[in-house]
Amino acid sequence: MARNRFKGLGVALVTPFTPDGEVDYPALKRLVNYQLDNGADFFCILATTGEAPCLTTEEKDRITETVKEINRGRLPILKYCGGNNTRAVVEEIKHTNWEGIDGILSICPYYNKPSQEGLYKH
């Protein structure tokens, strides 16, 4: 029987930016280490606070790999893969390197408001 790895204090990591609008990877590393040192039970990456809709695929990949590299399997990681475009969500899921990621956080399409059948198919 599978155990629920996502329990306790889950931290939705923010994506820090430099004043020029670039992802601040040194600051991201400090944030991950801070949470590891201060009692987090799992990470949620690239969700709303992680600015996923505003990031390129390359930035999301590098953020994912940076968090995995620092975490080294110590805490479970939940990765956000969601949006209104089902095809794009499926492509992101296929594209992601899932080694070191323990689950997917997704959402129902919120803009185009599909039917129940549409939600099921999404």
Where would I find each of the regions flagged by the language model?
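Active-site beta->alpha loop and helix N-cap motifs at the rims of alpha/beta catalytic domains
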Residues: 2-122
